[in-house]
Structures are given as structure tokens and as C-alpha cells.
């Protein structure tokens, strides 16, 4: 897997060894993974300006792109699901949140805990959303609060990916 140091800054991994990075993912510079987190195929995490932190039991799915600008670090909370082809740029995502496939979050955006950003949503610069929000559209807006059932669904998604990366860590073998 391509893991690069840049200007003396290298990605950091949990001491307990409980994480997984797909061999086609790219991690550069200031990237910090927490325990039970995973980075999937084709994802790029480019910590060349500020830190990118991936919280415990969170996953970055296939072909997601994460980048920062000076003054805009990125923190992804615990138990988060970052969907396929999501683009995150210098934003903050609260615990137990799901960012749907193809969503874009720009510098300074803040997503509260237990929130769901719909597929294809565009969260503009410095836009902030409260906890328990269902966020959709372009530009993104809150359409309602998340109920306990939806919050449990997000948590279940994080659980599935913890089991999945453990399966891949043990059983994935290159055959060609």
C-alpha cells in the first residue's frame, strides 16, 4: 500500500494494530488512524497541509478523497461511515455519522453527531449542521431530525465494516 512521509510527517497508526488499509489506498503525510478504522480501495488521504484524523471504528470507503488546506484540519469522529466516492475537504464530522456516496463537504463544514448526509449532497464552505440532522441537496440543507432507528442504522453500518476489514485482513489474497 502506498504510504508516504512528506516533509518529515508520516501517517500514524494505532499501537494495537487494529486497523486495515487496502493496498490501493494512498496515505500521505499527516494522517492519523484510530483503532478499528479502515481505509478502502482507491481512497486517497492527503495530509499535506493539516492533520486528517479517522476516528475509532470509522471507515473511508472506496475511491473517497480526503484533503486539507492550511487552517482547515479534518476530524472524522468515531463510528462514522464515509461512503464511496465522497470528497471531504478540511471539515469536521461528528461521531456516529454517515456521509452518503458522492457527497462533497468543503472547508470548514461541520456535521453534528448522529447525522446523515445524503448521497450527492454539497455541503458548502463553513456550513454547520446540528446533531441528529438528515442533510440533503445542493446546496445541502437539513430536512428533518434523525430518529433512533436511523441512528442505529448508521451504527450498524460501522459494525459491518469493522467485521469486513477483519475478514479482508485475514482472508484477502492476491491471485494475479
What spans do the regions from the language model cover?
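Left-handed beta-helix
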Residues: 17, 22-23, 28-29, 34-35, ...
